[in-house]
C-alpha cells in the first residue's frame, strides 16, 4: 500500500496551498485552488466544528460528477484541490462516485490533492484514495483520550460508549502511522483556544511522535457559526502560546501557522518580535490564507460557490450555471474583497482574511498600512 508519485515533494519551501505562489508565478492572485464539500455526514460532533450546523443524518442528491470535472477543466491555472465535509470518507458510495474521481482527475492533471478526514474509519477505506492523495489533513485538539471522547462528541445527542470512542482514538493514531508509511503527508491541525492551550505541548508530542505526522498546523480559533460559543484567545495570550510552541517544538517537523492575526504592518513591537522569530525558525512557515485569494468552495449538493465553507458571505454563483473563474472575478469586485486586498511584497504578506479582520481588526484599513519589518 504505497503512493506512487513523481511530483515535487511538498515541503516548507513548496506548499501548493500557499496563495503567494500565485503572485510569484503570475504577478497577482489567481484562482488556483478549489475546495469541494462532498458530504454532510459525520461520525463525530466536535464542539469546535466550523461546519457543525450543516451536518445531516443523510446526504442530499449530489450534482453529476461530470459537471464538477467540467468546472475544474475550465480553470487553466488549477494547482490544488481539497475535499472536505462532514467526514468525506464515511459513505463508501460517495467515496467511489465523487471523492475518488475528483482526486484521480486532479492527480492525473498534476494538481495537488488534500482531503480532510478524522481518520477514525477502517484503513481499508483510505486505500481507495492513497494512490491519488498528497495530503491527509486531520484536526487534532485532544490532550488525552478522555478529551477526545468528550470534545469530539460534545454536540452528539446519542453518543457511542466511552470504549467505542476510545477505540476511534486508537484507530486514528494507527491510521496516521500507516498512511505516513504509505507515502501520504499527514498534516494535523490544532486550534489555539482556551481548551487546547493547557495541553499544547502534549498535543504536539502526540502529533509528531505517536502519529508520525510530517506537519503540525496551528491555527487560532475564531468564533464561526457552530463553534461561536468557544472562547478565543486574546492577542496577548495567542502570542504567548506561539512563543511557547516554538520553545518546545520538534524542529525536524514542519510547523505551519495559518490565519495568524499578526502582521508586519503592526505598530505593536510584541507582534514584530514574534514575526521575526517565526521568520528565523527552522522548518516553520506562516501561510497566507487561501480563502478568497486563491480558493473558492463548491458544495456538490446545491452547487453553490462560496468563499469559504464556514463563512456567512452570500454565494458568488452556482456551478449549474456559472464557471468558477467567473465567480472568482465576481468575488474580486466585491466591497469585502477589496477591503481585504492588501499586499506587502517585501514580507510576502497578503493581509487578513474575513474571520481575522472581524475578530480583531474591524476598524483597521489594511490597505493604508505598510510592512515595518
Swiss-Prot record:
Cited SUPFAM superfamilies: Radical SAM enzymes
Binding site for [4Fe-4S] cluster: 42, 46, 49
Keyword Coiled coil among record annotations: no
The Radical SAM core domain, residue ranges: 26-256
Keyword 4Fe-4S part of the UniProt annotation: yes
Entry keywords, A to Z: 4Fe-4S, Iron, Iron-sulfur, Metal-binding, S-adenosyl-L-methionine
Transmembrane stretches, start-end: none
Record-linked InterPro entries: Aldolase_TIM, rSAM, rSAM_YfkAB, YfkB
Cofactor note: Binds 1 [4Fe-4S] cluster. The cluster is coordinated with 3 cysteines and an exchangeable S-adenosyl-L-methionine.
Family: Belongs to the radical SAM superfamily.
Protein name: Putative protein YfkA
